[in-house]
Amino acid sequence: MRFTNIVTSFIKNGDRILILKRSDKVKSMKCLWAGVSGIIEKNDTSPLARAKTEILEETGINEEKIELLKANKQIKIEATQYKNHEWNIFPFLFKTENPEIKLNWENSEFQWIKPNEIKNYETVPE
């Protein structure tokens, strides 16, 4: 089975978390809501380093404006859109205070939601 290593970060601001709507220009999971995500590259020093890079690229929030709250265990999920493929997801939770969000081309919208509101959004697979 093939696999892809991915980071997914959720950013907390008070009692809300940031979710992003993936644009129709990305390769997979188009127009679905998710945390800040990206593929871990071969030259990345760690999943945490990649998570911080993705946060900057996708939201404009730099490393000085975020604080790591939790790094969870790796999660393995079968990729439904590819045969014999697995996503290895490295999840992170960060906090920030009232950041200005500047989306890049990978996402078309963002929302600050209470965690229990996630059920109201069409999200990437769990």
Language-model features: where?
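Short aromatic/basic micro-patch
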Residues: 34, 86, 112
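Conserved N-terminal beta-strand and adjoining loop/helix that marks the start
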Residues: 1-18
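Conserved hydrophobic "DFG−1" position in protein kinase catalytic cores
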Residues: 11-12, 19, 94, 112
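Active-site segment of metal-dependent pyrophosphate-handling enzymes
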Residues: 60-100
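Short secondary-structure boundary/capping segments
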Residues: 1, 9, 25, 84, ...
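NUDIX/MutT-family hydrolases
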Residues: 91-95, 102-126
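Conserved Nudix-box catalytic region and its N-terminal flanking loop in Nudix hydrolases
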Residues: 16-58
